[in-house]
């Protein structure tokens, strides 16, 4: 595997995660394909398109405060111009005065476009959320 492609894909994922955690949702737009698909937990539905995708991040950032956030077990696989990145996450946040604990695995698919990795598909797997 081309290690530089792998490292650049991992860097794109870090950039996306840092931007939304810092509330800079608009910064995600250039890193997300216009027709990105996000599958909801347990595959109960999906959204398609950058506008709807970013709206979910915007809603969370406007209405929740992250108190703790951790990632581990990141795996980055690259084949040609496609990268699949997964990682476990754990987060504690407050929304509408209530404190929540959530954990699971995030799965992102990236496609190389014009020498940059662009997110094209996302699913949140094994997600568990409960009052904290």
Located regions from the model:
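Short beta-strand edge/turn micro-motifs at domain boundaries
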Residues: 101-132
């Amino acid at each position: 595997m081309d290690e530089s492609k792998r490292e650049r894909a991992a860097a794109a994922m870090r950039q996306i995660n840092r931007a939304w955690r810092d509330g800079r949702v608009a910064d995600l737009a250039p890193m997300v394909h216009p027709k990105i698909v996000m599958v909801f937990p347990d595959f109960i539905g999906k959204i398609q398109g950058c506008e709807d995708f970013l709206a979910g991040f915007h809603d969370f950032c406007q209405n929740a405060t992250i108190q703790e956030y951790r990632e581990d077990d990141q795996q980055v696989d690259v084949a040609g111009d496609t990268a699949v990145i997964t990682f476990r996450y754990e987060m504690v946040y407050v929304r509408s005065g209530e404190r929540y604990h959530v954990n699971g695995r995030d799965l992102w698919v990236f496609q190389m476009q014009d020498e940059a990795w662009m997110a094209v598909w996302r699913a949140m797997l094994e997600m568990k959320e409960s009052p904290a």
